[in-house]
Regions:
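An aromatic/glycine/proline-enriched structural segment found at the starts
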Residues: 37-46, 203-207, 211, 236, ...
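Bacterial N-terminal signal peptides
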Residues: 16-29
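M16/insulysin-pitrilysin zinc metalloprotease superfamily fold
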Residues: 109-113, 144-175, 341-396, 463-468
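Acidic/histidine-enriched segments that form metal/cofactor-coordinating
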Residues: 7, 20, 37-40, 45, ...
């Protein structure tokens, strides 16, 4: 294994082990046998010191209104960068839904300085990847490159961001690809279920405008539409740049000043995303001949900025484990029942299951919600869930791209990037009473959608008085 790569792997492994040791310490209390350290057994760092150490790796600055977050990871062989665009679904409407996704996808095909063939040749030679993605709250133009080829990759990346070609041929190619992808959504039960769920959960909300668009809205868009939309979005007040890798912050500032920092500042001010409100339980059934019923139910959840997000994460993890135990392990009603918590500005959590016996499966899942609401969980259960959560979380943060995405998410919709690294103490502070409180507050008025056999669904089971 390359020595630098080995150091990077050992670094992330040490972070995980440190957090798990700290979790074990907090779970067990400060017993005398642990507290009395020997000279050869130094005390484990506190959560506060870990947070401070991680925060010190991040440098933030502004260039002409463009906020930049630079996280240095010494020894890393790769660099990840993302130019994030604020707004998401709030930027579009029912008539132009999908324009931002199409604009970013078409931009990566060619730019003024790097026509299609030249761009593909250079990116292939360096192993560099330029891509894009979008969600309800923001979109991103992304870069993944080796440290060796970062400077040249940055030139291409910024040319794509600033001077995309939007040729008729490129736009038509990407347009067709996106339309074909959307056209078969109803053929995939899981994808179709999510589409049905969005229509029910997001009625009257900006999220109803899908950033993916529809075949109809995408087909109406022309290159001139993309150029006008690009000009509108490329203002530093709308953008956030995040870079993670073994780079010098002053050098990064110089690169930004000579490229993205020359964009107009603009006057964009992000609007507060309205929170969702479900006033009652409901079930919407779409008939489809399938081997099993596909079922999902959503309830409102706290956003990342709310103190309730910490006990809600623990409650959702407990619910997931209990649902799996009751539905899959004990009764084998479904292969992969699930409880989940998303990370949106207007947030939701929910239940998911595929089952022939829809009523029994949902009844069991709702019973587990009632159990969380009425029976205090043990402190041991909470600490076990937190330890499991931390393991999964930090393993998921091994790559520079994942860390860049996490910093951006918290900066854009989570109250600031520092909240992405100081949640340990807040998770550890969750109490059994907190679990009961958030379960009662949020896990109610569930909006169910069912794709399958209507005759197998007792709507009374789905709309039972959970949490009421």
């Amino acid at each position: 294994m390359n020595e630098s790569l080995k150091q990077s792997f050992n670094h992330i492994r040490q972070i995980i082990l440190t957090f798990l040791l700290l979790a074990a310490f907090l779970a067990g209390g400060s017993s005398a046998s642990y507290a009395q350290q020997t000279p050869t057994q130094p005390a484990q760092p506190s959560a506060h010191s870990i947070v401070a150490k991680q925060a010190a790796l991040v440098t933030e600055f502004e260039v002409n209104g463009l906020k930049v977050l630079m996280k240095r990871r010494e020894g890393s062989l790769t660099v990840a960068a993302g130019l994030f665009i604020r707004g998401g679904s709030a930027n579009i409407n029912a008539q132009n839904a999908g324009i931002e996704t199409l604009m970013l996808s078409a931009a990566t095909e060619a730019s003024a300085g790097f026509p299609r063939e030249r761009m593909r040749s250079e990116l292939s030679r360096m192993g560099t990847v330029i891509g894009s993605s979008s969600n309800n709250d923001y979109s991103v133009l992304s870069l993944a490159a080796t440290r060796m080829h970062f400077d040249r990759s940055w030139q291409i990346f910024t040319d794509v961001a600033l001077r995309p070609s939007f040729t008729k041929e490129d736009v038509a190619l990407v347009q067709e690809r996106l339309i074909v992808s959307l056209s078969d959504d109803t053929d995939n039960p899981d994808v179709y279920l999510q589409k049905l769920q969005d229509k029910i959960a997001y009625v009257g909300h900006p999220y109803l405008n899908s950033t993916s668009g529809t075949p109809e809205t995408l087909a109406k868009l022309a290159p001139d539409d993309l150029r006008a939309y690009h000009t509108k979005l490329m203002q530093t007040s709308r953008l956030l740049l995040v870079i993670v890798g073994d780079l010098n912050p002053p050098e990064v500032r110089t690169l930004v000043e000579s490229s993205l920092g020359k964009l107009p500042r603009g006057t964009y001010k992000p609007e507060t995303v309205p929170q969702l409100a479900f006033d009652k339980s409901s079930v919407d059934i779409t008939a489809r001949e399938l081997p099993t019923n596909y079922i999902q139910g959503l309830f409102t959840a706290p956003p990342l900025t709310s103190p309730d997000i910490y006990p809600m994460r623990v409650a959702s993890s407990l619910l997931r484990d209990r649902v799996f135990e009751e539905v899959r392990v004990k009764r084998n009603l479904s292969y992969a029942p699930d409880a989940f918590l998303r990370t949106q500005a207007a947030n939701v959590g929910g239940l998911y299951v595929t089952a022939k016996d829809a009523n029994l499966s949902v009844r069991l899942m709702l019973s587990e919600i009632q159990r969380l609401q009425s029976e205090p969980v043990s402190a041991g259960d909470i600490h076990a869930v937190v330890a499991q959560y931390l393991t999964t979380y930090y393993l998921g943060q091994e790559t520079n791209a994942a860390q860049a995405g996490e910093l951006a998410q918290y900066e854009l919709i989570g109250g600031g990037w520092r909240n992405s690294i100081d949640f340990l103490e807040k998770l550890m502070a969750v109490t059994p009473a907190d679990i009961q409180r958030v379960s009662q507050k949020y896990m109610r008025n569930i909006r169910f959608v069912v794709l399958g056999n209507p005759r197998s669904v007792d709507t009374g089971v789905f709309t039972g008085a959970v949490g009421e």
